[in-house]
UniProtKB/Swiss-Prot annotation:
Family: Belongs to the PHYHIP family.
SUPFAM superfamilies in alphabetical order: Fibronectin type III
This protein's name: Phytanoyl-CoA hydroxylase-interacting protein-like
Organism field: Mus musculus
Glycan attachment residues as annotated in the record: 22, 36
Record keywords, A-Z: Glycoprotein, Phosphoprotein
Lineage, uppermost ranks: Eukaryota, Metazoa, Chordata, Craniata, Vertebrata
Listed GO CC annotations: mitochondrion
Length: 375
C-alpha cells in the first residue's frame, strides 16, 4: 500500500502540537509524546488503544520502506487509522541557519501489516530518519481517539538501485552529443602526489574511496575504490586541454592500457553543479576484479563498443576510442596504475580550481539530470 501524505495538523512525538496547512481529511491534532493536547483539539479524550511496539523496518529502498509492529489485542478491533511521524534525523554538524526540513506526517487506514510507505517527495536516498507510530480510532462525529506514541525508531534509506541508475542513464543519453576521437586518459595532481606515489607505493597510483560528489543516492559514493581519469579533448586540436582544476602535473596513459576487451564499462552517475555543464561518471574495471564484482551488482553495464559516452572499437586491427562531446566524463579505473605505463609532465595552462568537482553537490532542481526519486 502506498501511504498518502497527511495534510493536517499533527504533532510530532518529540515536539509540541503544531498547526500545519494541508489537504483533504478532517482537521486533526494529535498529542505529543506525553499525551498532551491543546484545548481546541479535535481529538476525543484519550481512550485505551494499543500502543505500537517492537517496530520493524525492512525492504528499504531509496524512496520506500515497509513498516510493521506488534500490538496488544485489547481494543485492536477499534483501530481505524495509523498515524506515522517521519523526520530526518537531526545532524548536529549541519548549518544552524539552514532551513530545517518540515517533519512529514502520514496517515493510513488500518491495513494488514507490514505496510509500505513510499514517496519521493519526502524520502531521500542514503538518509537517516526517525519514525514513530500512533494507532487511532475515528469516531462518528469525526473526532479521533489515539494511543500514545510508540518508541522512536531510526533507519537509513538505501542507495539508487540499477533501475534508478538506468533512468539516469537514459537522461544522460539524450544530451551526450556526438562522439569525438581521443587516444589518452589523463590525471592531474600536484607534484607532491606523484612524489608520494613513487616513494611510498612502488611507483603505482592506488585506488581510493570515491568522494560524495554527484547524486546523493549514487551507490559508488563513499564506497567504490578507484582512480579518477579524464579523457576530454579540445575541439580544435583533438588533444587534452592544458588547463585543469586538480593540479599542474599530468599523468598521461594510452587509452588501450586502461580500456580494452579485458575490461568492463559501467554507468555510475549523471549530475550537474548549478551550471550548464553536465557530468557523467563511468567506471572501467578489469574483468573479474573486485571492482568489477562491485559494479556488476550495483551499476548498469554498458556495451564498450556501442554506447553514447565512451567507446572502444577495432578498425583495421587497431583499437580506436571516442568520447561524448556534450558531457564531461569522469572515468574511474578500479585497479592500481603504474606510473611506468605513462608519462608525467607539467601542463602549460592554468589550475582552474573553480571547476573542481571534489565533493560537489548535485543541483536537485535540474530537470535534465534528476529523476523522480530522492535527490
Amino acid at each position: 500500500m502506498e501511504v498518502p501524505r497527511l495534510d493536517h495538523a499533527l504533532s510530532s512525538p518529540s515536539s509540541p502540537c503544531e498547526e500545519i496547512k494541508n489537504l483533504s481529511l478532517e482537521a486533526i491534532q494529535l498529542c505529543d509524546r506525553d499525551g498532551n493536547k491543546s484545548q481546541d483539539s479535535g481529538i476525543a479524550e484519550m481512550e485505551e488503544l494499543p500502543v505500537p511496539h517492537n517496530i520493524k523496518i525492512n525492504n528499504i529502498t531509496c524512496d520506500s520502506f515497509k513498516i510493521s509492529w506488534d500490538m496488544d489485542s485489547k481494543s485492536k478491533d477499534r483501530i481505524t487509522h495509523y498515524f506515522i511521524d517521519l523526520n530526518k534525523k537531526e545532524n548536529k554538524n549541519s548549518n544552524k541557519f539552514k532551513h530545517k526540513d518540515v517533519p512529514t506526517k502520514l496517515v493510513a487506514k488500518a491495513v494488514p501489516l507490514p505496510m509500505t510507505v513510499r514517496g519521493h517527495w519526502f524520502l531521500s536516498p542514503r538518509t537517516e530518519y526517525t519514525v514513530a507510530v500512533q494507532t487511532a480510532s475515528k469516531q462518528v462525529d469525526g473526532d479521533y481517539v489515539v494511543s500514545e506514541w510508540s518508541e522512536i525508531i531510526e533507519f537509513c534509506t538505501a542507495d539508487y538501485s540499477k533501475v534508478h541508475l538506468t533512468q539516469l542513464l537514459e537522461k544522460a543519453d539524450v544530451i551526450a552529443g556526438r562522439m569525438l576521437k581521443f587516444s589518452v586518459f589523463y590525471r592531474n595532481q600536484h607534484k607532491e602526489y606523484f612524489d608520494y606515489v613513487r616513494e611510498h607505493y612502488g611507483n603505482a597510483m592506488q585506488p581510493s574511496i570515491k568522494d560524495n560528489s554527484g547524486s546523493h543516492g549514487s551507490p559508488i559514493s563513499g564506497k567504490l575504490e578507484g582512480i579518477f581519469f579524464s579523457c576530454s579533448t579540445e575541439f580544435n586540436t583533438g588533444k587534452p586541454p592544458q588547463d585543469s582544476p586538480y593540479g599542474r602535473y599530468r599523468f598521461e596513459i594510452a587509452a588501450e592500457k586502461l580500456f580494452n576487451p579485458n575490461t568492463n564499462l559501467y554507468f555510475g552517475d549523471f549530475y550537474c553543479m548549478y551550471t550548464a555543464y553536465h557530468y557523467v561518471i563511468l567506471v572501467i574495471a578489469p574483468v573479474g576484479s573486485p571492482g568489477d564484482e562491485f559494479c556488476k551488482q550495483r551499476l548498469p553495464q554498458l556495451n564498450s563498443k556501442d554506447n553514447n559516452f565512451l567507446t572502444c572499437t577495432e578498425e583495421d586491427g587497431v583499437l580506436v576510442y571516442h568520447h561524448a562531446q556534450d558531457v564531461i566524463l569522469e572515468v574511474i579505473y578500479t585497479d592500481p596504475v603504474a606510473l611506468s605505463l605513462g608519462t608525467v609532465a607539467e601542463i602549460t595552462g592554468h589550475q582552474l580550481m573553480s571547476l573542481s568537482t571534489a565533493n560537489a553537490k548535485k543541483d536537485p532542481s535540474c530537470k535534465t539530470c534528476n529523476i523522480s526519486v530522492g535527490r
